Amino acid sequence: MPRFLPEPPHRHGNPATTAVVLVNLGTPDAPTAPALKRYLKEFLSDPRVVEIPKPVWWLILNGIILNIRPKKSAAKYASVWMPEGSPLRVHTERQAKLLKGLLGQRGHHLTVTSAMRYGSPSIPEVLAHLKAEGAKRILLVPMYPQYAASTTATVVDEAANWLTKIRNQPEMRFVRNFHDHEGYLAALEKSVRQHWQTNGSLGDNDRLLISFHGLPKRSLDLGDPYFCECHKTGRLLAERLNLKPEQFQICFQSRFGKAEWLQPYTAPTLHEWGSKGVRRVDVICPGFVADCLETLEEIAQEGRDDFLKAGGKEYHYIPALNEDDAWIKALADIAEQHLGGWSTKTAFDPHALETSAREAFKFGARA
């Protein structure tokens, strides 16, 4: 088997284009048990996601989880599925389209597309397509505001693995995080204030719950900065909203398994608040820039049930940033910052490219 993937012949006179790729977690292709089984197998087989000895985890995953979870998860996905497909994929594709338009308005000549770490379109598929189209410079933007080894790092891993198979590699850059980016925080603040304009501000007996996806506590103990970056995002957002400490709480959702995860946990907090007389809860999930199963089902549906059944009176989920104009502007600012030094504002001159190719051939270059 060849060490490298087949490479098209080098062609003189082709423009060196630039591409931006928005990368999110991933999604099954359909809200069905078979599709969920394929997706979960890929996702939960990533050693960045599950740090358990491989032989032990293989038995648990293939013997138990993949025989139980797909059917249950399929029903949950079906409850949030959009006519166009999975919410996460739909919103990410829309974000890429809007980002391309805004960067174009700012004078950039580049391609903007999206990829998924698990499922399709995969990172290798998208990178291979961009390379075939002539991309020589690629900026990957993992859509995770807070860095974690199980999210951002595995995107870098997958892209780097693809690069090891490429003879003629493009330049590649990665955005590490943007948890304290001014534009991102401003977009979050705007979404909360717009919600309050419609539903009223928080009263004395109301709370804002700032919920992030959870990780095993072991990740923090081993040096992962995710917990600290989540707290910084939550604290800065609360400051912008002029909230007192007793008016908000940072929590972590989606606990899986019996191990201790980052705390406090979202679901028990909602239950406790409802049982202790908190009247209203507004929930925002800053770690998700596009709505998905974890926000639309776990928070918007299950969270509401937990709080109201425990005695709460009013519950609101504040949607993810999705296609909000302030967020797309922030995303463009983030992309521009990391595109620095790459020539993206100069239109290609076909005559100059043709002349360059002609000169190369004159001095013996291969056609």
From Swiss-Prot:
One of its GO terms (cellular component) is cytoplasm. Its EC number is 4.98.1.1. PROSITE patterns: FERROCHELATASE. It catalyses: heme b + 2 H(+) = protoporphyrin IX + Fe(2+). InterPro entries: Ferrochelatase, Ferrochelatase_AS, Ferrochelatase_C, Ferrochelatase_N. Gene3D superfamilies: 3.40.50.1400. One of its GO terms (biological process) is heme biosynthetic process. It is found in: Cytoplasm. Fe cation binds at H213, E294. GO terms for molecular function: ferrochelatase activity; metal ion binding. Pathway: Porphyrin-containing compound metabolism; protoheme biosynthesis; protoheme from protoporphyrin-IX: step 1/1. Its main location: cytoplasm. It holds the Pfam family Ferrochelatase. Keywords: Cytoplasm, Heme biosynthesis, Iron, Lyase, Metal-binding, Porphyrin biosynthesis. Disulfide bonds: none annotated. Catalyzes the ferrous insertion into protoporphyrin IX. Belongs to the ferrochelatase family. This is Ferrochelatase. It comes from Dechloromonas aromatica (strain RCB). The lineage of its organism: Bacteria, Pseudomonadati, Pseudomonadota, Betaproteobacteria, Rhodocyclales.
